[in-house]
From Swiss-Prot:
PANTHER family: METAL TRANSPORT SYSTEM ATP-BINDING PROTEIN TM_0124-RELATED, ZINC IMPORT ATP-BINDING PROTEIN ZNUC. It is a peripheral membrane protein. The complex is composed of two ATP-binding proteins (ZnuC), two transmembrane proteins (ZnuB) and a solute-binding protein (ZnuA). It comes from Rickettsia conorii (strain ATCC VR-613 / Malish 7). It is an enzyme of class 7 (translocase). GO terms for biological process: response to zinc ion. This is Zinc import ATP-binding protein ZnuC. Residues 6-222 form the ABC transporter domain. ATP binds at G38, P39, N40, G41, A42, G43, K44, T45. The lineage of its organism: Bacteria, Pseudomonadati, Pseudomonadota, Alphaproteobacteria, Rickettsiales.
Length: 233
């Protein structure tokens, strides 16, 4: 059995008197798409900061290979596409040393050629998310963390985004860890779903989210509407 690339073991984190996450355990498997969902204030940002080494756990253990290269796109970046700089120049700033080689490979499946000379501020939502993905992989990471990448995208753009993510992980052998509020899209496109509300309410593979299952009931209790998962689309 393959060793997970990240493992949280009974992790808790306190900030003063606040305990945003309590006794959290989960694993992230190599080359999977793992999605973390939960309401506002559930501790999702704290999980990401712990993954990135920006915070240390108050108790518990986080097992992560120190050589693991992580590409991270924060939520705020995804919501502020107003930079007065071209796509090509922006990517070059992120990875100047190996830019030419990497951008050719990225271009082969993300297809930035027709927008590379456009200013970021002029891009559509779908085009901007392509740039977000390119930013996350331009330095050849083993794992990419995407914080709410589907916000402000229509259904068609969301599906195109997931198609790109699948292509990227297969071509580059990259693991994907995502935070999302869009449960229905998550269920269709993730290998593993983790539901967080300060602690792990439920986790598993999408086909375990069946009506009246423990997983489905936990999601419903947090306000996630799961019934429409039964319908054929």
């Amino acid at each position: 059995m393959q060793k997970p690339i990240i493992e949280f073991r009974n992790v808790s984190k306190k900030f003063g008197n606040k305990l945003p996450i309590n006794n959290v355990s989960f694993t992230v498997k190599k080359n999977n798409i793992t999605t973390l969902i939960g309401p506002n204030g559930a501790g999702k940002t704290t999980i990401v900061r712990l993954m990135l080494g920006l915070e240390k756990p108050t108790s518990g253990e986080i097992i992560i290979d120190p050589k693991l290269k992580i590409g991270y796109v924060p939520q705020k970046f995804g919501l502020t596409p107003d930079l007065p700089i071209t796509v090509k120049n922006f990517l070059e700033l992120l990875a100047p040393s190996n830019f030419n080689n990497n951008i050719k490979e990225i271009n082969s499946f993300i297809d930035l050629e027709h927008i590379k000379d456009q200013e970021i501020s002029k891009l559509s939502g779908g085009q901007f998310q392509k740039v977000v993905l390119a930013c996350s992989i331009v330095n050849n990471p083993d794992l990419i963390i995407l914080d709410e990448p589907l916000q402000s995208l229509d259904v068609t753009s969301q599906q195109e985004f997931y198609q790109l993510i699948n292509l990227i992980r297969k071509k580059l052998n990259i693991t994907v860890f995502m935070i999302s509020h869009d449960l229905f899209t998550v269920i269709k496109n993730s290998d593993q779903v983790i539901c967080l509300n300060g602690h792990i309410c439920c986790s598993g593979i999408p086909n375990e989210i069946t009506p009246n299952s423990e997983f489905s009931n936990a999601l419903s209790a947090l306000g996630f509407y799961t019934h429409h998962h039964d319908h054929k689309h």
